């Protein structure tokens, strides 16, 4: 089972709000997930990012692959370094 850390979309039309979740790569975007590790609100000024660092590091250590967007959010929050290739 390939596990990914990715965004799950919530919110109304044109007003997205995302939860950062750990899910099986075969699950649909808004489908089943294993664990919720934070949220991302791009509409807020400045954008609101809240991540449980302990959970994120735990999932990265067991081999979960972050999506490109989640990887950039992790870099902003300092969870993974800019030179780290996940």
Swiss-Prot record:
The keyword Lyase does not apply. Keywords: Ribonucleoprotein, Ribosomal protein. Belongs to the bacterial ribosomal protein bS16 family. Gene3D superfamilies: 3.30.1320.10. This is Small ribosomal subunit protein bS16. GO terms for biological process: translation. GO terms for cellular component: cytoplasm; small ribosomal subunit. Signal peptide: none annotated. It comes from the Bacteria. Coiled coil: none annotated. The gene is rpsP. GO terms for molecular function: structural constituent of ribosome. It comes from Thermoanaerobacter pseudethanolicus (strain ATCC 33223 / 39E) (Clostridium thermohydrosulfuricum). The lineage of its organism: Bacteria, Bacillati, Bacillota, Clostridia, Thermoanaerobacterales.
């Amino acid at each position: 089972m390939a596990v990914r850390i990715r965004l799950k979309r919530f919110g109304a039309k044109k007003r997205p709000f995302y939860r950062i979740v750990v899910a099986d790569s075969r699950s649909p975007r808004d489908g089943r997930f294993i664990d919720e590790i934070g949220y991302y609100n791009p509409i807020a000024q400045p954008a609101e990012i809240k991540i449980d660092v302990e959970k994120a590091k735990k999932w990265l250590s067991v081999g979960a692959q972050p999506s490109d967007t989640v990887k950039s959010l992790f870099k902003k929050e300092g969870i993974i370094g800019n030179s780290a290739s996940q």
